[in-house]
Amino acid sequence: FSNHTYDYIVCADVLEHLRKPERILDACRQLLSPTGQLLISVPNAGYCGLVAELMQGEFLYREEGLLDTTHLRFFTRRSLQRFLREHGWGIEALDTIQRELPESEFKARFDHLPPAVARYMLGTPDALVYQFIGVARPGLEACANP
C-alpha cells in the first residue's frame, strides 16, 4: 500500500477486537491522504442493559452483541474520545445507533432493577446508545461535544 493515498479508511467494528488497536490507528495515519478520514464504529460499553448486568454481578460473553466473545476492548463515549486523542486523532463527528431494551440481549437483566435505579440509568445521555459511529482525522482537535 502506498503511503498517504487513501481518502477514507473504514474500521467498522474492528477496534474492539484488537489487543492493541493503537497500532491500526498508526497504520491508518500513514495510509490516509492529508485530508483523509477514518470512519469508525464501536459498541458502547455504557449501554444501560450492559451496566444493569454488571450491577447484578454478571459479565456474560455471548456469541454476538456488546459482549461478543471476540471483544477485547470496550469503549464509552468518553473513553473512545480519550483513546483517539491519546493516539493523535480527533473526532470530527460522532453519531449513534440506539437500541431499545426490549430489542437487546440485556432486557431480562434490566427488568430486575429497582424502578428508581432503572429510571436513573435511562436518564443518562448514552443509556440507549448501542453503538458509536464516528469520523476521525489525525491531529484534529476533538469537537466540543460530538
Task: Give the predicted meaning of each segment.
Residues 1-3:
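Short conserved loop adjoining the S-adenosyl-L-methionine
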Residues 6-8, 19-33, 37-145:
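S-adenosyl-L-methionine-dependent methyltransferase catalytic module, highlighting the catalytic core
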